[in-house]
């Protein structure tokens, strides 16, 4: 199949220029100022439009079994929502139950995804327990047959996904050995569990309890701790869903000291805030329950966008994990039973454009970087993904920077009956989405084929992740001091050395040296 994109402005992370793009058999085969159409060639006109790399969402949870429920967006509906929003690749998470084989869990996720995806996808692996078998299986899944190059560790969800600090540290040592990226959900799970118990016993059962049980300081503390431990392990670290200024500051602090740490804000945290948890409508408040929670500071979304612009945060994602109103209502008497998760995979690109480019905070090239290219580089699929270039996959979006749309549950493609961005008008709209040379979204209509997406193996040893690690490791090597042998004196020698010392008995005097005290009792 061949396709020609005419008269558009190509935007990569490092350049913008007018050119045509010729696609054949899923690859970009030519980029030139004026490519002439040939008979039978499908032509897409992109006059006054931007031609950008398809978005890559590096953090989704499609059909995740969680808190006794299963996320509503499966790999079919979830990837349809993705392409409708201009995202052409997702990276989902294999999450084994505690003690489960990584290989068994991997096969289960592939069995769910392969028959359903309408765009390409990769996988990351969560480590929910630690043993020699887990370490061995980590090595196995980083091989080409499995294609995993990152491992996620939860410092929250005590008793379910959470690992202890020593397990986290051992896991990072193994990641460093395998040249795989460690990813972390940074919250203090032990303190959260205590706070939940206290709040419930105090009669606070509504969604406001969720945010009160997880104050921002606990995210900041866990982020700082995770960065410190990763530095000691000389392991690159990727902090998922950075939701607060404190967590972002912890990342910046360690990067300034030379640590290899990446920070990922998500669409929800860039476009809304935690005031919703205090809405008098219980269901409205419950819809926004996710972990870490949205910041209660209304200035945080803008601050996170400015940190993206400054390079202190590095790429955007969604943590898309959707539960409908019925599922959310299962926690009506206990906020700890509200399934955690929100939507985002369909609206991320428009949200970032609106709050970033349209607001004058980032330029279109930075937009491409934080929505596509950085993810491709970090997860080692660049320039196959994340770039408009000859030889790259034809994952392309025709972007109308001047158009607007109003986000609504009535028009979105998620499998849920609400949208956390409901009523928000955003600038920047994907008019056409192309996955591997196939048009999958055009004129407001899906043109997808279930199962047409492919699994993308992600090899370890990404250059942007590991290029600084080896030299840093040399600087961190233990230092041994070479000394002459120490010969301790024997007990007899020590006794003889003290033989001539005169020991005087204690003598009590009426007037001690320095005179008598003037204090009278």
Segments from the language model and where they lie:
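Histidine-rich, glycine-flanked metal-binding segment
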Residues: 2-4, 10-53
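Divalent metal-coordination and catalytic microenvironments
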Residues: 8, 26, 48, 59, ...
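Metal-associated gating/positioning segment near the N- to mid-region
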Residues: 47-116, 133
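Alpha-helix-loop-beta-strand connector modules within alpha/beta enzyme cores
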Residues: 103-119, 169-184, 347
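Histidine/acidic residue-rich metal-binding segments in metalloenzymes
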Residues: 133-316, 321, 333
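His/Asp/Glu-enriched, well-ordered alpha-helical/loop segment
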Residues: 205-225, 229-234, 310, 314-316, ...
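C-terminal cap of metal-dependent C-N hydrolases
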Residues: 330-334, 340, 390-455
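Peripheral, non-catalytic segments of secretory and membrane proteins
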Residues: 480-521
């Amino acid at each position: 199949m061949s396709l020609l994109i005419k008269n558009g402005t190509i935007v990569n992370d490092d350049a913008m220029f007018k050119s045509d793009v010729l696609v054949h058999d899923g690859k970009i085969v030519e980029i030139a100022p004026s490519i002439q159409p040939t008979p039978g060639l499908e032509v897409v006109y992109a006059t006054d439009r931007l031609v950008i790399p398809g978005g890559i969402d590096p953090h989704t949870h499609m059909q995740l079994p969680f808190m006794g429920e299963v996320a509503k967006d499966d790999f079919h509906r979830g990837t349809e929502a993705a392409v409708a929003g201009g995202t052409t690749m997702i990276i989902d998470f294999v999450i084994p139950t505690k003690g489960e084989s990584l290989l068994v869990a991997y096969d289960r996720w592939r069995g769910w995804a392969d028959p359903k995806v309408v765009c390409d996808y990769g996988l990351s692996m969560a480590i929910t327990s630690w043993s020699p078998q887990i370490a061995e299986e980590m090595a196995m899944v980083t091989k080409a047959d499995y294609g995993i190059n990152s491992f996620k560790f939860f410092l929250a969800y005590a008793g379910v996904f959470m690992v202890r600090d020593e397990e986290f540290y051992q896991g990072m040592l193994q990641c460093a050995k395998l040249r795989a990226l460690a990813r972390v959900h940074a919250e203090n799970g032990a303190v959260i569990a205590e706070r939940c118990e206290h709040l419930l016993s105090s009669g606070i059962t509504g969604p406001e309890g969720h945010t009160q049980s997880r104050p921002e300081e606990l995210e900041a503390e866990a982020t700082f701790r995770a960065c410190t431990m990763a530095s000691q392990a000389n392991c690159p670290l990727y902090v998922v869903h950075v939701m607060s200024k404190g967590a972002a500051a912890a990342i910046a602090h360690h990067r300034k000291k030379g640590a290899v740490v990446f920070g990922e804000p998500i669409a929800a945290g860039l476009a809304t805030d935690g005031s919703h948890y205090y809405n008098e409508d219980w269901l409205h408040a419950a819809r926004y329950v996710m972990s870490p929670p949205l910041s209660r500071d209304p200035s945080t979304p803008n601050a996170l966008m400015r940190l993206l612009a400054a390079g202190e945060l590095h790429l955007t994602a969604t943590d898309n994990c959707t539960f409908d109103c019925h599922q959310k209502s299962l926690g009506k008497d206990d906020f700890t039973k509200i399934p955690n998760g929100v939507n985002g995979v369909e609206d991320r690109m428009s949200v970032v454009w609106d709050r970033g480019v349209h607001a004058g905070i980032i330029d279109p090239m930075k937009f491409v970087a934080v929505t596509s290219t950085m993810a491709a580089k970090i997860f080692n699929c660049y320039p196959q993904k994340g770039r408009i270039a000859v030889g790259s996959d034809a994952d392309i979006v025709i972007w109308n920077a001047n158009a607007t749309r109003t986000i609504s549950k009535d028009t979105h493609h998620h499998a849920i009956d609400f949208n956390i961005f409901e009523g928000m008008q955003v600038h920047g709209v994907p008019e056409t989405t192309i996955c591997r040379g196939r048009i999958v979204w055009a004129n407001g209509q899906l043109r997808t084929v279930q199962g047409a997406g492919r699994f993308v193996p992600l090899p370890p040893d990404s250059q942007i992740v590991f290029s600084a690690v080896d030299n840093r490791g040399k600087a961190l090597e233990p230092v041994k001091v070479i000394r002459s042998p120490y010969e301790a004196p024997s007990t007899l020698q020590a006794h003889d050395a003290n033989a001539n010392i005169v020991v005087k008995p204690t003598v009590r005097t009426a007037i001690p040296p320095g005179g008598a005290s003037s204090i009278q009792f």
